Structures are given as structure tokens and as C-alpha cells.
């Protein structure tokens, strides 16, 4: 299942041939470099490691000048990318498995790649189904009303516990809180995958993918777009 690493730019709308207005998420996926290729006899399955973006190697400013934004690449990343023939270290590294069950069911050949190859948005086509993985927006520590959608307590008749969870378990037996009880806690900033999303448009010149609907993550967040099957 080959895919591509991209950056979520935001949402917009497009119009199809019937004149219908379709909300779309725009993902910018500049050409991904193949960093490493792993075979089945090495790790048990065929996979490819892709690199997205760029990191600066060292401080690119002279004495007295402002330091440019962005973190500096670790020497390990620089050396890892150099083995694939890259002079600039990628910002993000992700692995994509190639010999998944869907390829076997459809009796499709496993694609072959070599270090240094480029993966572009042209691997997708309008109308194709994809699944997108991103990191949802972090919302910090939240109560049960926002985190789980609880209704809260009454607003009148002297009640002061408007957003409390209420009872969290019986007292006499079993005299404990059952595992899995929905409670206040950290909300968001979790890996989330949405499946069966439709590619509405491909802009090869600007490396853009227009995907119908919403995609998890904030603006400028990193997302993985994979073929559905």
C-alpha cells in the first residue's frame, strides 16, 4: 500500500460537473524521496521509507545575524539521508508497507522502488479512495462534557454541579470504579485514521491533493495519505 507524506493546508470547496459544492481538505505533498527499501526476507514484509520536507544541517547565519527558523538536523538523520543520495535531510520520515492484504486479494503486483526515487501526487487519481492518518488537535485536560459529550447536571433547583460526571460507580458492591469508565483527562493530540475518503482533484503543478471532507489535524499538520486498495 503505497502512499505519500503531506502537509494539511486547510479546507476549501470545489464544484463537480453537476455543479455540486463539495468541501475538500487541501494537502500539499511535495515529492517524497525514497530513503530506504526493506524486503520481506529482512523484516517479514516489503516496505519503503519515505522522507518529506527539508531540515537545515547547520546554522545558516553569520555572526550577528538572526538565526533562521527551524530546527537543525541530527547528524544521524543527515547520514541516513546521504545513503539515499540526498544532500538535504528530510523533515519527516515514515514507512509504508507494500505487501498488504488488499494487494494480495486483488492479485496486484508489489511495486518496486530504489533509494533516491521520487514519489509524487501523480500516484493518485481523481475518484480514487484513500485513507488519511493525522494527529488530531490537542485540547489539553478536559472534563467529561467536552471530552465524552456528557449532558451534565441540572441547571436549576439549587444544583451547582453543572458539568460534573455524577456517580462513577456503585458504593457497596463492587466498591470500586470499573475499568474503562469515561472520566476527565487529556483530550486530542492522538493518531487518527479516516478511511474511504475520495480524491476530488489533483494539482500536479503545485503538488496538491484535494480530498473530500475533513481530515484530522491542525493547519500545517503532517498527514499520511495512503491508497485504500
Please name every model-derived segment.
Residues 1-229:
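Extended basic (Lys/Arg/His-rich) segments that typically form rRNA-contacting surfaces
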Amino acid at each position: 500500500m503505497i502512499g505519500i507524506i503531506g502537509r494539511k493546508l486547510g479546507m476549501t470547496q470545489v464544484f463537480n460537473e453537476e455543479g455540486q459544492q463539495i468541501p475538500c481538505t487541501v494537502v500539499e505533498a511535495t515529492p517524497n524521496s525514497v530513503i530506504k527499501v526493506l524486503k520481506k526476507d529482512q523484516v517479514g514484509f516489503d516496505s519503503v521509507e519515505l522522507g518529506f520536507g527539508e531540515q537545515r544541517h547547520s546554522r545558516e547565519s553569520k555572526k550577528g545575524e538572526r538565526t533562521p527558523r527551524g530546527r537543525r538536523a541530527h547528524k544521524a538523520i543527515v547520514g541516513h539521508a546521504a545513503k539515499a543520495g540526498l544532500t538535504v535531510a528530510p523533515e519527516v520520515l515514515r514507512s509504508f508497507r507494500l505487501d498488504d492484504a488488499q494487494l494480495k486479494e486483488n492479485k496486484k503486483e508489489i511495486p518496486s522502488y530504489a533509494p533516491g526515487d521520487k514519489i509524487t501526487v501523480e500516484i493518485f487519481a481523481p475518484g480514487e479512495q484513500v485513507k488519511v492518518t493525522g494527529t488530531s488537535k490537542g485540547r489539553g485536560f478536559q472534563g467529561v462534557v467536552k471530552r465524552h459529550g456528557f449532558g451534565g447536571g441540572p441547571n436549576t433547583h439549587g444544583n451547582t454541579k453543572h458539568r460534573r460526571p455524577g456517580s462513577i460507580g456503585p458504593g457497596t458492591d463492587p466498591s470500586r470504579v470499573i475499568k474503562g469508565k469515561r472520566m476527565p483527562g487529556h483530550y486530542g493530540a492522538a493518531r487518527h485514521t479516516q478511511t474511504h475518503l475520495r480524491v476530488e482533484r489533483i494539482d500536479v503543478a503545485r503538488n496538491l491533493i484535494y480530498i473530500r471532507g475533513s481530515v484530522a489535524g491542525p493547519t500545517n499538520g503532517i498527514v499520511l495519505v495512503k491508497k485504500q486498495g
